[in-house]
Design a protein with these regions (language model features):
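Conserved N-terminal beta1-alpha1 strand-loop-helix module at the mouth
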Residues: 1-68, 72-77, 89-90, 149-156
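Conserved anion-binding
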Residues: 7-8, 75-76, 80-163
Length: 163
């Protein structure tokens, strides 16, 4: 997948709702809004209803890309990348936060690309206590290295702090 979203600027509604009825309403009411470029689904819907059912509900109303955010996918061993890529079948792209190191990051990116998934990589989160400078576990250099490795793997889409 070369470009996840077809436009240079877009809105990506985050479908963090608790059931398929609320998802249906959200998608129906936004899919024709100019500027909506994709939909982001997360683990609440995916684990409760399954990715195929969630994707099917969205596809009833739009063919816009569906981005799956597993709330920190790529934080496990490198070998699970291929299993993850198979498990998210139906999504067009995934968000990875590879905090477990370069081996995992590269393996998961390669597995997702092999499965024809778009890849978006995040390295920094903005909640209190995340970064070492805010008494968190993750140091600032590590987050920068995550982005550098992803760019080296030809990733062009990133989750970056907006504040």
């Amino acid at each position: 997948m070369s470009q996840i979203i077809r436009s240079n600027k877009s809105i990506i509604p985050s479908c963090d709702v608790s059931d398929l009825t609320k998802l249906r309403t959200l998608v129906k009411e936004t899919c024709s809004v100019d500027g909506v470029g994709a939909y982001k689904i997360g683990l609440e819907l995916a684990l409760r209803f399954g990715i195929p059912a969630v994707v099917s509900e969205i596809r009833k109303h739009t063919n816009l890309p569906i981005i799956y955010d597993h709330q920190k996918a790529a934080t496990d061993i490198p070998e699970l990348g291929e299993k993850f890529a198979k498990a998210v079948k139906g999504a067009d792209a995934v968000i990875l936060f590879p905090f477990t190191g370069p081996e995992t990051e590269i393996a998961w990116i390669k597995a997702c690309k092999k499965a024809k998934l778009g890849v978006i990589v995040g390295g920094e989160m903005t909640h209190k206590g995340f970064l070492e400078s805010d008494n968190g576990f993750i140091n600032e250099k590590g987050t920068f290295t995550i982005y550098e490795i992803a760019a080296g793997q030809k990733i062009n889409d990133f989750v970056v702090p907006g504040n």
